[in-house]
Swiss-Prot record:
UniProt topological domain (Cytoplasmic) ranges: 1-35, 89-102, 174-176
Source superkingdom: Eukaryota
TM region(s), chain numbering: 36-56, 68-88, 103-123, 153-173
Keyword Membrane: yes
Pfam families linked to this entry: CASP_dom
Keywords: Cell membrane, Membrane, Transmembrane, Transmembrane helix
Lineage: Eukaryota, Viridiplantae, Streptophyta, Embryophyta, Tracheophyta
Name by which UniProt lists this protein: CASP-like protein 5A1
């Protein structure tokens, strides 16, 4: 046997078909960042927060109550956060990239947790004031109780859309 010629020759692997490769991995559950479900949740968060913000701004006396000012501030933050992440999710879907970077996922978890907490607290505070004005003081004829209730309900729905995003992203981070 000649030592300069190996007895085993390399075998060329068959080329992979890149056009039919699976786009979503098994661990990509809908609702996680970079999925169509995640984009839908982000757009839902954004829409509900915009509606709550718009309804609250349509009243002329929301600024006299601290809880309503807090609701406006929380929904503005929720709008900005949800829109930014919806753009990132949409881009990830367009270029078929996975958002699995630990730093990115950590940022998403912290941001979702903060905005979810702020939105929920603002909705609860606004609900308390709305009940106080409507049921206890019985001054709905002098105030915009219907608008306050609708804005509060939209804030709760926005929080309801943030919660799955937060839980799924937290699960993604914790499962690393």
């Amino acid at each position: 046997m000649n030592p300069s010629h190996p007895a085993v020759h390399p075998v060329e692997a068959p080329p992979t078909d890149v056009h039919h490769a699976p786009r979503v991995r098994m661990k990509d559950y809908q609702g996680m960042p970079g999925t169509l479900g995640g984009l839908a949740l982000r757009l839902g968060q954004f829409c509900f927060a915009v509606v709550a913000f718009s309804i609250m701004l349509s009243t002329d006396d929301f600024s006299t109550v601290t809880a309503f000012c807090y609701l406006v501030a929380a929904t503005v933050l929720q709008c900005l956060w949800s829109l930014a992440l919806a753009v990132i999710d949409g881009y990830a879907l367009l270029v078929k990239r996975s958002l699995r970077n630990s730093l990115v996922v950590s940022l998403f978890v912290v941001g979702d947790g903060v905005t979810a907490t702020l939105t929920f607290a603002a909705a609860c505070a606004s609900a308390g004031i709305t009940v106080l004005i409507g049921n206890d003081l019985r001054e709905c004829d002098q105030n915009h109780c219907g608008k306050y209730e609708t804005a509060t309900a939209m804030a709760f729905l926005s929080w309801f859309m943030v919660s799955p995003s937060f839980l799924l992203t937290f699960w993604l981070l914790a499962s690393r």
